[in-house]
Design a protein with these regions (language model features):
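Hydrophobic/aromatic-rich alpha-helical bundle segments in the mid-to-C-terminal region
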Residues: 117-122, 130, 152-200, 208-224
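Hydrophobic alpha-helical connector segments
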Residues: 72, 86-112, 163-170, 216-218
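Amphipathic, non-transmembrane alpha-helical scaffold segments
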Residues: 28, 70, 74, 78, ...
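Short secondary-structure transition hinges
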Residues: 107-146, 165
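N-terminal intrinsically disordered/low-complexity leader segments
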Residues: 1-22, 211-224
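Generic hydrophobic, amphipathic alpha-helix propensity
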Residues: 23-31, 48, 73-77, 81, ...
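Helix-turn-helix
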Residues: 2, 26, 34-68, 72
Length: 224
């Protein structure tokens, strides 16, 4: 077994578990980085082993296949993200605080572990049908929906708005920001944009802004 050369993070990744041996942790860390950068299909077991500093046999000791490794990583990263969002957007908080918590967790995760966030974002469609029932019970979109429903009750979100469209708008805004940030389209730290992201989302969902936009569209003859 080769000695890995990768420096440890200043903070432990959320997807590491207490009983994971060091070799498994390093394999997962380097596999995640490669998957986030190149996609699962674009990565070979040999590449993962080379980056982690371990032989292919070490990977197969823990995972039957590369796809099994990818699925395990996805479930761990997704659940860690959900738990962070859930803790920051607790049901007893008012709508504004819950939305603030969601945006804050998202941008902090982009700084703390962008590979994990981008991997979950990019692989959600293909991985979600394959995850365990326990993971499926923890829906990030469901958490956003619950937050929006509270906003409706507090008159912070328009009651006649289609929640699915609002969920798509919020998740799409955050996901595209993450991708553009990773491409260098935004300068500075992710958290520097947190306040503006939150204000954009509030404008999307607020009753007053929706009514203004609808009125303008009607005057332009855009509504049927």
């Amino acid at each position: 077994m080769l000695t890995h050369q990768t420096a440890a993070r200043t903070s432990q990744p959320d997807y590491w578990q207490i009983d994971d041996p060091p070799s498994k942790r390093m394999i997962m860390k380097e596999a995640l980085h490669l998957f986030a950068q190149k996609g699962i299909e674009g990565v070979t077991v040999r590449e993962i082993g080379a980056r982690a500093g371990y032989t292919n046999a070490a990977l197969f000791k823990f995972f039957a296949t590369k796809d099994a490794l990818a699925l395990d990583l996805f479930e761990r990263c997704y659940l860690a993200l959900f738990e962070s969002l859930s803790a920051a957007a607790r049901p007893e908080l008012p709508f504004a605080d819950r939305l603030h918590g969601i945006v804050t967790v998202f941008v902090r995760q982009m700084e703390r572990d962008p590979d994990a966030l981008l991997f979950v974002q990019d692989q959600l469609r293909s991985m979600w049908p394959r995850v365990s029932p326990g993971i499926r019970r923890h829906s990030i979109l469901g958490l956003i929906r619950a937050t929006l429903k509270q906003g409706v009750r507090e008159n912070r979100v328009r009651s006649t708005a289609n929640l699915n469209l609002l969920i798509a708008s919020i998740s799409g805004t955050l996901q595209q920001f993450a991708r553009m940030l990773s491409f260098g389209e935004f300068r500075g730290r992710a958290t520097a944009w947190s306040g503006e992201l939150e204000q954009i989302i509030l404008r999307i969902v607020s009753p007053a802004q929706l009514e203004i936009n609808a009125s303008k569209s009607f005057r332009r003859g855009e509504l049927q």
